[in-house]
Amino acid sequence: MKKLTIVAAVLAACSATAAMAQASGEGPWLVRARAVHLDMANRDGTGLGLLVNNKTIPEVDVSYFFTPNIAAELVLTVPQKQTVSLGGAPIGTFKHLPPSLLLQYHFTGLDGYKPYVGAGVNYTKITSVNLLDGGATLDDHSWGGALQVGMDIPLDKNWSLNFDIKKVYIRSDVFLGTANQGALKLDPVLVGVGLGYRF
């Protein structure tokens, strides 16, 4: 009985917050598609001089508004292939999948401009590591924080133009054979532009 009471309370709270979001005249869901430039910090703690390339990637995110001001955003992309270089020469590649979950605060009442800030967590899965013909490898995952600032500019009732900047903290230990050489901190800044649809 106690569990049923808790479940009912949670459902009631979700319904109430969704109703608050809808009371603003906008639906609680926002889906965006962005082109994002990934700019690696490349803070190499191994002393080897490793660098990971920058690139532009596709990104999709889904936001749910609990109130007109408070939302949660899930940021997704497809696995990305990166090149690792040493002394300017490529030594191999790896793939990473870096979804992030952020809690956002959206500012309202600014004559059509809708800035927001966010903070949350990133989980990066690292796969398909091929460095020095198998002589080196990386940790297979990373947990870290994520920070965000952005702005939506409404184009009509549903569509909006979006500008977004995120700082994501990603690191991986580097191994030569079984010896840990230290951490490579990628810590990229992601600068994105795209379109959003609110419903």
Language-model regions: role of each:
Residues 37, 61-131, 188-199:
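Gram-negative (and chloroplast) outer-membrane scaffold detector with strong preference
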Residues 21-63, 72, 127-128, 194-196:
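Short glycine/proline- and aromatic-enriched beta-strand/turn motifs that initiate or cap beta-hairpins
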Residues 42-49, 82-90, 127-136, 173-180:
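Outer-membrane beta-barrel translocator domains and adjoining extracellular loop/strand segments
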Residues 4, 25-29, 68-70, 111-115, ...:
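Outer-envelope beta-barrel architecture signal
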Residues 99-103, 118-123, 140-151, 165-167:
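Hydrophobic alpha-helical segments of small multi-pass membrane proteins
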Residues 52-54, 142-144, 152-154, 158-162, ...:
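Subset of outer-membrane beta-barrel
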Residues 1-27:
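Cleavable N-terminal export/targeting peptides
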